[in-house]
Amino acid sequence: MFYLSDLLLHVIGFG
């Protein structure tokens, strides 16, 4: 699921 990976990247970026 590519969209989940993109979402995780955003979360990590904000983290």
Swiss-Prot record:
Changing F2A: Increases severity of growth defect on galactose upon overexpression. Transmembrane segments: none annotated. It comes from the Bacteria. Changing Y3A: Partly relieves growth defect on galactose upon overexpression. Induction: Higher expression after 5 minutes at 42 and 45 compared to 30 degrees Celsius; at 10 minutes the protein levels are similar at all temperatures (at protein level). The keyword Transcription applies. GO terms for biological process: regulation of carbohydrate utilization. Disruption phenotype: Cells no longer have growth defect on galactose (upon overexpression). GO terms for molecular function: regulatory RNA binding. Coiled coil: none annotated. Plays a role in carbon catabolite repression (CCR), which prevents expression of genes involved in catabolism of nonpreferred carbon sources when glucose is present. Encoded in dual-function Spot 42 sRNA (spf gene), it inhibits CRP-mediated gene activation when cells are grown in glucose, especially at higher than 30 degrees Celsius (when Spot 42 sRNA base pairing may be less efficient). Overexpression of this protein leads to decreased cell growth on non-glucose carbon sources, with particularly poor growth on galactose. Encoded within the Spot 42 sRNA (gene spf, a dual-function sRNA) which acts both as an sRNA and mRNA. Interacts with DNA-binding transcriptional dual regulator CRP. This is Small protein SpfP. The lineage of its organism: Bacteria, Pseudomonadati, Pseudomonadota, Gammaproteobacteria, Enterobacterales.
